[in-house]
Amino acid sequence: MARKAKIVRKTKETDIALEIDLDSNAASSIDTSIPFFDHMLDLFARHGFFKVMVKSKGDTQIDDHHLVEDLGICLGMAVGKALGSKVGINRYGAASVPMDECLCRVDLDISGRPYLIYKVKFERRKIGGFDPALVKEFFKAFTDHSGITLHINLAYGSNSHHIIESVFKAFARALRDAVAVDKKIKGVLSTKGSL
C-alpha cells in the first residue's frame, strides 16, 4: 500500500497544496513563496528521503506567520494520513545533526499523542526577512495535526541559519527512522494494540 497523502487547505489567509510520499525519494518541488522556508522543506525532503510537493501562497505582506503555521498543519495532516494504520512502523526515531558550530537533537514518537518540547534559542531576530520564532510555530502545528510527540533540543550553536538547518535535518532523519517499516513488528508497536 502506498504511503502517501495530499492535503489542500484554503483559508482567507493561505492557499496550500501539499503532498508527501514517505517511500519515494524522487525529486521534490517546493514553492511556499518564502524562499528561506523553501530551503528548509527541501532539506527535510532530502534528508528524510521523502518526496514532498508544495505550492502555497499567503498573506506574507503582513508577515510569514500564517503561512508557516498552516504549512505545519498541512504537513502534519499529510504525514498522519500517509501513515494510515501505522502497522509495522518503528514508531520511534532520533537523530543528532551537527551544522558547523551547532548541534541539534530530535527525538520523536508516533504515538497518537501530540506534544512538543522545543528548546532552541536564537541570537538573531531575523534571517534575511524570516523570523526564526516561526520555526516553533511550524513544529507546534505539525505535532498538533500529526499526533506525534516531538522533542527538539539545541545542544549549542550561535548562527541562526545553521541552527534551523540542523533542526530540519535532524527532524527529517528522526522521522525517516520512525516511519520505516520493520517486518519483525506485527501489528503496531504498542501493548495497547493501537497508536
Give residue ranges: language-model regions.
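Structural preference for solvent-exposed beta-strand-turn elements
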Residues: M1-L195
